[in-house]
Amino acid sequence: MSPQTETKASVGFKAGVKEYKLTYYTPEYQAKDTDILAAFRVTPQPGVPPEEAGAAVAAESSTGTWTTVWTDGLTSLDRYKGHRYRIERVIGERDQFIAYVAYPLDLFEEGSVTNMFTSIVGNVFGFKALRALRLEDLRIPPAYVKTFQGPPHGIQVERDKLNKYGRPLLGCTIKPKLGLSAKNYGRAVYECLRGGLDFTKDDENVNSQPFMRWRDRFLFCAEAIYKSQAETGEIKGHYLKATAGTCEEMMKRAVFARELGVPIVMHDYLTGGFTANTSLAHYCRDNGLLLHIHRAMHAVIDRQKNHGIHFRVLAKALRMSGGDHIHSGTVVGKLEGERDITLGFVDLLRDDFVEQDRSRGIYFTQDWVSLPGVLPVASGGIHVWHMPALTEIFGDDSVLQFGGGTLGHPWGNAPGAVANRVALEACVQARNEGRDLAQEGNEIIREACKWSPELAAACEVWKEIRFNFAAVDVLDK
């Protein structure tokens, strides 16, 4: 017997398996201000008590494993273990529970979303004792928030760079998303920007394919930006997508965008990964580039109500990792997004301090201290008739992005941009005059049609378009 084994045996080590709840279920635990708090929706397998299921989550996402190990005696488990300190039954669900877990801050590397997620949502999601598991929310303590740079610039700095205030920003995703040559792509960018949009965007599907290599696209888009700026007197931008197969290639594209003098680049933070995203965000801050974030792949992770990670958690992770814009759903368009839930995570993106509010799905009070805010981007199946609702729902600090709702205009791209800009200006003016956009929205748009034939044509095309489907992810009643 080795000396280490003898020493361990002498202090009472007992090999074997014991229930997780004996160590990790600690209802008497008082969460510390420095703890990371998590709310999990737990669906145990039949026969597994909820206390044991919740404790298993705390164990397997912190210091625990399936059996006792003698090396437990070489550290302080009470200092490092996760604490499942509260559990509550989900209203209206027989076999679902919300388990609250507190994680000591020393479990996590400073400034690393990658490490935080690897621990909290790692192997535990495949645990056999659980039928399903969903991370509903995280409370990130200020002590941990302060280890992150966060967004490269934030809302106020972006407005100052663009010299645009008092209204939402307008964007457009270039369509068709795939197949255009670089020159034709640049032409569409120019026409949309000249027509009155603030931004155009690479579709998330666009990278560097045989029909359009990234360098060619960057050059033609830069030409379109400068030409439209000269003609309109407004600062313009195009989200040049830097996402690539390697981090080195991603950075090369960002460097080229900076050399062209364009104001903004784009990244897919979920498919590209948190490490790559954080690296790009640091580069963007150091070099004066805004960073637009797309959430491609999010619905694979967040759409099902009983399993995965809620988007409010992914939104918090993005604010920590870094991004100046992120797509957040529209409430009224073609993509999933219930109003109260959407407004909850929009506040988590923009505000410095957000109170707990279960009516909007916010499980914890979140203090972002000095971390800059992120502009939510409403995009997906929206058109001019949606403008009053979008302006009322998202307010000024947002980006309203119309792809088909610009490029599908019967008269072409520039008139489509004009229609959207006129509709937005009409809604902002009406709101500033005290009119109710929710009740008078259609009337406001019809009035604006009288002095904008471009808007009138757009209204005629999309007057019957609705996306009236029940949301999959809704609040517990």
Curated annotation (Swiss-Prot):
- Listed GO MF terms: magnesium ion binding; monooxygenase activity; ribulose-bisphosphate carboxylase activity
Name the reaction it catalyses: 2 (2R)-3-phosphoglycerate + 2 H(+) = D-ribulose 1,5-bisphosphate + CO2 + H2O; D-ribulose 1,5-bisphosphate + O2 = 2-phosphoglycolate + (2R)-3-phosphoglycerate + 2 H(+)
**Leading EC class:** lyase
Record localization: Plastid, Chloroplast
Q: Which residues carry this modification: N6-carboxylysine?
A: K201
Q: What does the cofactor section's free text say about binding?
A: Binds 1 Mg(2+) ion per subunit.
Annotated propeptide span(s): 1-2
Entry-annotated residues carrying N-acetylproline: P3
Note the superkingdom of the native organism.
Answer: Eukaryota
Residue positions of the PTM N6,N6,N6-trimethyllysine? K14
Report the InterPro entries cross-referenced here.
RuBisCO, RuBisCo_large_chain_AS, RuBisCO_lsu_C, RuBisCO_lsu_C_sf, RuBisCO_lsu_fd_N, RuBisCO_lsu_N_sf, RuBisCO_lsuI
What are the annotated GO cellular component locations? Answer: chloroplast
Where is this chain primarily localised? plastid
- Could you say which protein family the record assigns here? Belongs to the RuBisCO large chain family. Type I subfamily.
Q: Any miscellaneous information on file?
A: The basic functional RuBisCO is composed of a large chain homodimer in a 'head-to-tail' conformation. In form I RuBisCO this homodimer is arranged in a barrel-like tetramer with the small subunits forming a tetrameric 'cap' on each end of the 'barrel'.
Q: Which biological process terms from the Gene Ontology are attached to this UniProt entry?
A: photorespiration; reductive pentose-phosphate cycle
Which residue positions does UniProt flag as site: Transition state stabilizer? K334
* Active site per UniProt: K175, H294
Keywords, sorted A to Z:
Acetylation, Calvin cycle, Carbon dioxide fixation, Chloroplast, Disulfide bond, Lyase, Magnesium, Metal-binding, Methylation, Monooxygenase, Oxidoreductase, Photorespiration, Photosynthesis, Plastid
Q: Does the keyword Plastid apply?
A: yes
What this protein needs as a cofactor is: Mg(2+)
| Residues engaged in binding Mg(2+) | K201, D203, E204
Q: What does this protein do?
A: RuBisCO catalyzes two reactions: the carboxylation of D-ribulose 1,5-bisphosphate, the primary event in carbon dioxide fixation, as well as the oxidative fragmentation of the pentose substrate in the photorespiration process. Both reactions occur simultaneously and in competition at the same active site.
> What gene, per UniProt, encodes this protein?
rbcL
Give binding positions for substrate: N123, T173, K177, R295, H327, S379
Q: What is this protein called?
A: Ribulose bisphosphate carboxylase large chain
- The answer to whether the entry has keyword Hydrolase is no
